[in-house]
Amino acid sequence: VILMDQQGRVPTKTKPHRDVNQAIKHLKLEAEALSRAHGNLDETFEDACEMILKCQGRVVVTGMGKAGLIGGKISATFASTGTSSLFLHPGEALHGDLGRVRQEDVVLALSKSGATPEVVRLVPAARSIGASVLAICSPSQTPLGEEADIVLELGEAPEACPLGLAPTVSTTLMLAIGDALAMAVLEGRNFTREEFAAFH
């Protein structure tokens, strides 16, 4: 396929390797954010793992927009590695689907800002049922952080988007922290290859 401009001409690159250089810049931003995330891990992460290991119900993951898409993957990772989990859309939760949440569940709420309205409204409703709440957001002094039992902070997450708007670095951090949680819990359960195979 040959793309042409409005005058029917094949455009030429005036800035060789510009796209590659931009991609490298964006990857560096994400890699740097992941490196900084190491410094945010402390006993709070251990508390989060313990909360999930002691959970007698399911890990109910929730998030809006791109954070919700990341939440779906985190939930799937938990489910395939020995921790019963489901994803709950926060908008639907406030229109009846909150009935999926049980007292013995842990709600894992994702929001970069910690102020996503749908997620913030869901958390106290889940707490009123008796569920525990674990949040991944930044910073902890936010409406979501103040409602949660445990907060895992994203830390500094400047987006790779040139406009500073599209979730990029923040969603990478959410996914990495979610994966780290799932893998730590997997080890805590002594989850085996045979058990993993049974789910596949």
Predicted stretch roles:
Residues 1-3:
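Short, Lys/Arg-enriched N-terminal segments with co-localized hydrophobic residues
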Residues 5, 9-12, 16-57:
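An N-terminal, well-structured beta->alpha segment
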Residues 57-176, 180-186:
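Glycine-rich phosphate-binding loops that contact phosphosugars or nucleotide phosphates
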Residues 192-200:
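Long, charged amphipathic helices and adjacent flexible linkers at domain junctions
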